[in-house]
UniProtKB/Swiss-Prot annotation:
The organism of origin for this protein: Homo sapiens (Human)
GO cellular component: cell cortex; cytoplasm; cytosol; microtubule cytoskeleton; microtubule plus-end; nucleus
UniProt protein name: Tubulin-folding cofactor B
Entries under SUPFAM superfamilies matching the protein: Cap-Gly domain, Ubiquitin-like
Keyword annotations from UniProtKB, A to Z: Acetylation, Chaperone, Cytoplasm, Cytoskeleton, Developmental protein, Differentiation, Glycoprotein, Microtubule, Neurogenesis, Phosphoprotein, Ubl conjugation
PTM notes: Phosphorylation by PAK1 is required for normal function.
Length: 244
Protein backbone atom coordinates (compact mmCIF):
# COMPACT_ATOMS: atom_id res chain seq x y z
CA UNK A 1 0.00 0.00 0.00
CA UNK A 2 1.32 3.45 -0.85
CA UNK A 3 1.24 6.17 1.80
CA UNK A 4 0.93 9.85 0.88
CA UNK A 5 4.06 12.05 0.76
CA UNK A 6 5.56 14.27 3.42
CA UNK A 7 4.32 17.76 4.34
CA UNK A 8 5.60 20.81 2.48
CA UNK A 9 8.86 22.12 4.00
CA UNK A 10 7.43 25.66 4.18
CA UNK A 11 4.16 27.19 5.32
CA UNK A 12 2.48 30.52 4.47
CA UNK A 13 0.90 32.27 7.45
CA UNK A 14 -0.48 35.67 8.43
CA UNK A 15 1.41 37.58 11.13
CA UNK A 16 -0.42 40.01 13.42
CA UNK A 17 0.86 41.90 16.44
CA UNK A 18 -0.31 43.77 19.51
CA UNK A 19 1.95 46.63 18.34
CA UNK A 20 0.23 47.38 15.03
CA UNK A 21 -3.09 47.11 13.24
CA UNK A 22 -2.05 45.37 10.02
CA UNK A 23 -1.37 41.78 9.05
CA UNK A 24 1.48 40.47 6.92
CA UNK A 25 1.48 37.30 4.83
CA UNK A 26 4.82 35.51 5.07
CA UNK A 27 6.32 32.11 4.23
CA UNK A 28 8.53 30.31 6.75
CA UNK A 29 10.38 27.02 6.98
CA UNK A 30 8.74 24.40 9.19
CA UNK A 31 12.23 23.41 10.41
CA UNK A 32 12.73 26.70 12.28
CA UNK A 33 12.73 26.44 16.05
CA UNK A 34 10.31 28.78 17.81
CA UNK A 35 13.28 30.77 19.12
CA UNK A 36 14.63 31.24 15.58
CA UNK A 37 11.14 32.04 14.32
CA UNK A 38 10.84 34.83 16.91
CA UNK A 39 14.11 36.30 15.68
CA UNK A 40 12.74 36.45 12.13
CA UNK A 41 9.63 38.23 13.45
CA UNK A 42 11.63 41.01 15.13
CA UNK A 43 12.01 43.21 12.04
CA UNK A 44 8.44 42.51 11.00
CA UNK A 45 6.62 43.46 14.21
CA UNK A 46 9.22 45.58 16.05
CA UNK A 47 9.25 43.55 19.25
CA UNK A 48 12.42 41.96 20.72
CA UNK A 49 12.41 38.17 20.48
CA UNK A 50 12.86 37.88 24.24
CA UNK A 51 9.68 39.94 24.79
CA UNK A 52 7.40 37.96 22.45
CA UNK A 53 4.51 35.68 23.28
CA UNK A 54 3.14 33.78 20.26
CA UNK A 55 -0.40 32.51 19.73
CA UNK A 56 -1.55 30.28 16.86
CA UNK A 57 -4.97 30.74 15.24
CA UNK A 58 -6.52 28.45 12.62
CA UNK A 59 -7.70 29.40 9.14
CA UNK A 60 -11.10 30.05 10.75
CA UNK A 61 -9.34 32.47 13.15
CA UNK A 62 -10.09 30.28 16.16
CA UNK A 63 -7.39 30.01 18.83
CA UNK A 64 -5.36 26.78 18.59
CA UNK A 65 -2.48 27.02 21.04
CA UNK A 66 0.48 29.03 22.28
CA UNK A 67 3.85 28.54 20.59
CA UNK A 68 5.73 28.52 23.88
CA UNK A 69 8.39 25.82 23.47
CA UNK A 70 11.54 27.67 22.39
CA UNK A 71 13.35 24.56 21.13
CA UNK A 72 10.31 23.03 19.38
CA UNK A 73 10.14 23.15 15.58
CA UNK A 74 7.51 25.36 13.97
CA UNK A 75 6.34 22.30 12.02
CA UNK A 76 5.68 20.38 15.24
CA UNK A 77 2.64 22.61 15.81
CA UNK A 78 -0.56 22.35 13.70
CA UNK A 79 0.51 25.30 11.51
CA UNK A 80 -1.08 25.21 8.05
CA UNK A 81 -1.25 27.60 5.10
CA UNK A 82 -3.66 30.42 5.97
CA UNK A 83 -3.23 30.18 9.74
CA UNK A 84 -2.49 33.32 11.75
CA UNK A 85 0.27 33.76 14.31
CA UNK A 86 -0.31 36.64 16.72
CA UNK A 87 2.64 38.29 18.47
CA UNK A 88 1.94 39.70 21.93
CA UNK A 89 4.59 42.24 22.94
CA UNK A 90 5.76 42.45 26.56
CA UNK A 91 8.42 45.14 26.05
CA UNK A 92 6.15 48.00 27.09
CA UNK A 93 5.83 49.49 23.59
CA UNK A 94 2.51 51.09 22.60
CA UNK A 95 0.11 50.19 19.78
CA UNK A 96 1.18 51.92 16.56
CA UNK A 97 4.56 52.99 17.91
CA UNK A 98 6.42 51.29 15.05
CA UNK A 99 3.97 52.15 12.25
CA UNK A 100 5.18 55.78 11.90
CA UNK A 101 8.80 55.40 10.75
CA UNK A 102 9.40 59.15 11.16
CA UNK A 103 9.34 58.59 14.92
CA UNK A 104 12.05 55.93 14.86
CA UNK A 105 15.43 57.16 16.07
CA UNK A 106 18.22 56.25 13.68
CA UNK A 107 21.64 55.56 15.11
CA UNK A 108 24.77 53.46 14.64
CA UNK A 109 26.41 51.20 17.20
CA UNK A 110 29.87 49.68 17.40
CA UNK A 111 30.38 45.92 17.27
CA UNK A 112 31.72 45.89 20.85
CA UNK A 113 28.75 47.84 22.21
CA UNK A 114 26.34 45.57 20.34
CA UNK A 115 28.00 42.46 21.82
CA UNK A 116 27.60 43.89 25.34
CA UNK A 117 23.86 44.54 25.01
CA UNK A 118 21.52 41.96 26.54
CA UNK A 119 18.38 42.70 24.48
CA UNK A 120 19.69 41.73 21.02
CA UNK A 121 19.02 38.71 18.85
CA UNK A 122 22.63 37.61 19.28
CA UNK A 123 22.52 37.72 23.07
CA UNK A 124 19.17 35.93 23.08
CA UNK A 125 20.56 33.11 20.95
CA UNK A 126 23.69 32.88 23.08
CA UNK A 127 21.72 32.71 26.34
CA UNK A 128 19.34 30.12 24.93
CA UNK A 129 22.12 28.18 23.14
CA UNK A 130 20.03 28.22 19.98
CA UNK A 131 20.51 28.79 16.28
CA UNK A 132 24.13 28.75 15.15
CA UNK A 133 25.18 28.63 18.79
CA UNK A 134 23.85 25.08 19.13
CA UNK A 135 23.89 23.56 15.67
CA UNK A 136 24.76 20.13 17.06
CA UNK A 137 21.61 19.96 19.18
CA UNK A 138 19.45 21.23 16.34
CA UNK A 139 20.90 18.65 13.95
CA UNK A 140 20.23 15.94 16.52
CA UNK A 141 16.62 17.11 16.99
CA UNK A 142 16.02 17.12 13.25
CA UNK A 143 17.54 13.65 12.91
CA UNK A 144 15.38 12.31 15.75
CA UNK A 145 12.24 13.87 14.22
CA UNK A 146 13.09 12.36 10.83
CA UNK A 147 13.65 8.97 12.46
CA UNK A 148 10.29 9.12 14.25
CA UNK A 149 8.57 10.07 11.00
CA UNK A 150 10.26 7.19 9.15
CA UNK A 151 9.19 4.73 11.86
CA UNK A 152 5.60 6.00 11.72
CA UNK A 153 5.59 5.72 7.93
CA UNK A 154 6.79 2.11 8.14
CA UNK A 155 4.09 1.28 10.68
CA UNK A 156 1.42 3.03 8.60
CA UNK A 157 2.48 1.16 5.46
CA UNK A 158 1.59 -2.15 7.12
CA UNK A 159 -2.00 -1.05 7.84
CA UNK A 160 -4.16 -1.47 4.70
CA UNK A 161 -7.22 0.69 4.14
CA UNK A 162 -10.36 -1.44 4.48
CA UNK A 163 -8.89 -3.89 7.00
CA UNK A 164 -10.52 -4.71 10.32
CA UNK A 165 -8.63 -3.42 13.34
CA UNK A 166 -8.54 -2.99 17.08
CA UNK A 167 -7.39 0.26 18.67
CA UNK A 168 -5.73 0.17 22.08
CA UNK A 169 -5.08 3.77 23.08
CA UNK A 170 -3.79 4.75 26.52
CA UNK A 171 -6.58 5.30 29.02
CA UNK A 172 -9.27 3.78 26.76
CA UNK A 173 -10.84 0.37 26.47
CA UNK A 174 -10.08 -1.57 23.24
CA UNK A 175 -12.21 -0.40 20.30
CA UNK A 176 -12.87 -2.21 17.05
CA UNK A 177 -13.54 -0.81 13.63
CA UNK A 178 -12.44 -0.52 10.01
CA UNK A 179 -9.39 1.32 8.69
CA UNK A 180 -10.62 4.11 6.40
CA UNK A 181 -7.57 6.36 5.95
CA UNK A 182 -3.79 6.01 6.20
CA UNK A 183 -1.32 8.85 5.75
CA UNK A 184 -0.48 12.46 6.56
CA UNK A 185 -3.08 15.03 7.63
CA UNK A 186 -3.40 18.80 7.71
CA UNK A 187 -4.37 19.03 11.38
CA UNK A 188 -1.23 17.51 12.99
CA UNK A 189 2.23 16.35 11.89
CA UNK A 190 3.10 12.71 11.31
CA UNK A 191 1.19 9.71 10.01
CA UNK A 192 -2.34 9.00 11.18
CA UNK A 193 -4.82 6.14 10.86
CA UNK A 194 -8.44 7.10 10.27
CA UNK A 195 -10.77 4.52 11.83
CA UNK A 196 -14.54 4.07 11.52
CA UNK A 197 -15.54 2.47 14.80
CA UNK A 198 -18.32 -0.11 14.99
CA UNK A 199 -20.09 2.00 17.61
CA UNK A 200 -20.26 5.78 18.26
CA UNK A 201 -17.07 5.85 20.34
CA UNK A 202 -15.15 8.30 18.15
CA UNK A 203 -14.79 12.07 17.94
CA UNK A 204 -15.77 13.02 14.39
CA UNK A 205 -17.39 11.99 11.10
CA UNK A 206 -14.15 11.46 9.21
CA UNK A 207 -13.44 15.17 8.78
CA UNK A 208 -11.29 17.57 10.83
CA UNK A 209 -11.25 21.37 10.57
CA UNK A 210 -13.51 21.22 7.52
CA UNK A 211 -11.39 18.76 5.53
CA UNK A 212 -12.83 15.31 4.87
CA UNK A 213 -10.56 12.27 4.97
CA UNK A 214 -13.22 9.53 4.89
CA UNK A 215 -16.98 9.04 5.22
CA UNK A 216 -18.74 7.85 8.37
CA UNK A 217 -21.49 8.85 10.77
CA UNK A 218 -20.90 11.48 13.44
CA UNK A 219 -19.02 10.17 16.50
CA UNK A 220 -17.97 7.02 14.63
CA UNK A 221 -14.70 8.44 13.28
CA UNK A 222 -11.31 8.86 14.94
CA UNK A 223 -7.67 9.45 14.03
CA UNK A 224 -5.05 7.51 15.96
CA UNK A 225 -1.34 6.83 15.67
CA UNK A 226 -0.21 3.65 13.85
CA UNK A 227 1.42 2.30 17.03
CA UNK A 228 -1.95 1.75 18.75
CA UNK A 229 -3.60 -0.02 15.78
CA UNK A 230 -3.60 -3.80 15.29
CA UNK A 231 -5.10 -5.25 12.10
CA UNK A 232 -6.55 -8.75 11.96
CA UNK A 233 -9.71 -10.81 12.38
CA UNK A 234 -11.70 -8.53 14.68
CA UNK A 235 -15.45 -9.13 14.19
CA UNK A 236 -17.94 -6.61 15.50
CA UNK A 237 -18.70 -6.83 19.20
CA UNK A 238 -21.99 -6.10 20.94
CA UNK A 239 -21.27 -3.08 23.11
CA UNK A 240 -24.83 -3.00 24.42
CA UNK A 241 -25.29 0.62 23.41
CA UNK A 242 -28.74 -0.10 21.97
CA UNK A 243 -30.06 -1.37 25.29
CA UNK A 244 -32.43 0.85 27.27
Amino acid sequence: MEVTGVSAPTVTVFISSSLNTFRSEKRYSRSLTIAEFKCKLELLVGSPASCMELELYGVDDKFYSKLDQEDALLGSYPVDDGCRIHVIDHSGARLGEYEDVSRVEKYTISQEAYDQRQDTVRSFLKRSKLGRYNEEERAQQEAEAAQRLAEEKAQASSIPVGSRCEVRAAGQSPRRGTVMYVGLTDFKPGYWIGVRYDEPLGKNDGSVNGKRYFECQAKYGAFVKPAVVTVGDFPEEDYGLDEI
